[in-house]
């Protein structure tokens, strides 16, 4: 027997059609409109994140992304409170690519790189070398270079990113980025651990020593020869009254421009100095005697003609270049560098033939008819002579006593 039909038909699983209709999700048009709004919001946020690269902007957009996720979750919960065909909020949206690859903008983006120039690892300070090529890892943003084996020992460090071009010219990793490149030192040792380069150490020590010496010499102005000679000149007027005072005055004035040879002064006893000065003052004419080394032809009426070997008595030496002297009864001016002073017990010699000496043996070269003086005795056939600025040994057989 067929049961009677009822105006109320059961739906699926014995539920009424009204209940099934009430549980249906909203229309696809409303869902698509909500998705389009979310996509537009995501595009605007991603565009702003790419345009602004500062740290504050990154933090701002990360906070905005988290608020966006909460807003999306709230909107989806309002759309489907019980069940929804849309995926969960976690799978619906993902963090931006920048935040996914570099969480917080601090991670390095290492890539395989072949180093053409000698490069050192920023972790172990050793050179990146290989059998065939110099393979290693290099950060795409901050250009940090490391070995493959040093990736495990790499401490979590903040990537500074790409620097502006204006700042990149004066970029110095050891001085500006202490957190990332703290292991690099100003003088990087070449595969020698923490040892300092000996060449650098030597140069640094030499520079400091030179600066210290310069400061010390500039500070001790009272030790200069000019100051000492000036104090000596103060006593000159009192000593010029006695005999030989004029010579002593000239002697002291000339000592202003006299410097010790080889850094040594003539240290004598005071008694010896007094005796020496007394002997000089007794015979001032002897100390004012010079011998002509070269021939001088007068250029003016007041000039004094000289021939090699002439004995000249000095009358005035106020001018550095031209002196006034006397030869027998002739008086005139002559070049100061054409004469040689005669000391006591010095003899005058003339070279009879040209002699070429050996500098290694202390000999000098003299031309024919050149004048020289000497006060020493012969030793093994040689005698030490003085001719102008030259001083050395000459064979006695090439000299003639005049």
Swiss-Prot record:
It is found in: Cytoplasm, Cytosol; Cell membrane; Cell membrane, Sarcolemma. Promotes expression of the ion channel CACNA1H at the cell membrane, and thereby contributes to the regulation of channel activity. Plays a minor and redundant role in promoting the expression of calcium channel CACNA1S at the cell membrane, and thereby contributes to increased channel activity. Slows down the inactivation rate of the calcium channel CACNA1C. One of its GO terms (molecular function) is transmembrane transporter binding. Residues 1-47, 211-247 are annotated as: Disordered. This is SH3 and cysteine-rich domain-containing protein. InterPro entries: C1-like_sf (IPR046349), PE/DAG-bd (IPR002219), SH3-like_dom_sf (IPR036028), SH3_domain (IPR001452), STAC1/2/3 (IPR039688), STAC1_SH3 (IPR035508). Keywords: Cell membrane, Cytoplasm, Membrane, Metal-binding, Repeat, SH3 domain, Zinc, Zinc-finger. Interacts (via SH3 domains) with CACNA1S. Interacts with CACNA1H. Interacts with CACNA1C. Gene3D superfamilies: 3.30.60.20, SH3 Domains (2.30.30.40). Residues 285-344, 347-402 form the SH3 domain. The gene is STAC. One of its GO terms (biological process) is positive regulation of cation channel activity. A zinc finger (Phorbol-ester/DAG-type) spans 107-159. It is a peripheral membrane protein. It comes from Homo sapiens. Disulfide bonds: none annotated.
